[in-house]
Amino acid sequence: MFNGTREGALFALASVDMVDLHARPLPPQRPHSAGRALYRNNVGQKRPLRPKEVWAIRVRLQIKNRKRDLAMFNLAIDSKLRGCDLVSLRVDDIASGGHVRDRATIVQHNTGRPVQFEITEQTRASLQDWLNARPADRGPYVFPSRVHDQPHVTARQYARIVHGWIEGAGMDTSGYGTHSMRRTKAAQIYRKTGNLRAVQLLLRHTKIESTVRYLGIEVDDALRLSEQVEL
């Protein structure tokens, strides 16, 4: 069919490849949901808030007299809880006799293990203000939902609330999320002390490697800590 020239041989090979290409089934298309999940995975971890950003959000909530949001923000920073655990806190988890305690213990949804966290004076004050202003008939949860068929604020609603805090402070919303709240105090503790084991305990990680990844610790961080030690 083809002559014996070099051009004829190349044409023959190309023709075989084209036949094979048409006979070969096309790879299945990636569903849109998988694409979105892949995008989310490539975005990376959300950054912790810096102290000046914490104060910017806090002052804004105080000026606007947003008692619920101020209490939620302060407690999110102090407790270092995952969003699902934060929104499902009950009043009796954090208060006794109408007064907010300085420490609380709950059972985590994800792991089923108990966890203790501190409630600092500033957070206690904002929580006390919110509990005093919160309607008593709204159920047992610290942050009851405004939607009648939901007992408390959902994790999805919490994510939208956090987005509003970030946006209201004039920050880039793509860089922050609910995990920013969980990471903020832990990151500051690590930067000030270098005590990775303490941060691991506070975040309730079973493996130290998880804490390293969660904090995003890099070689530069290790070198910075090393430079602070003289022998």
What are these regions (language model features)?
Residues 2-3, 7-231:
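Conserved catalytic core of the tyrosine transesterase superfamily
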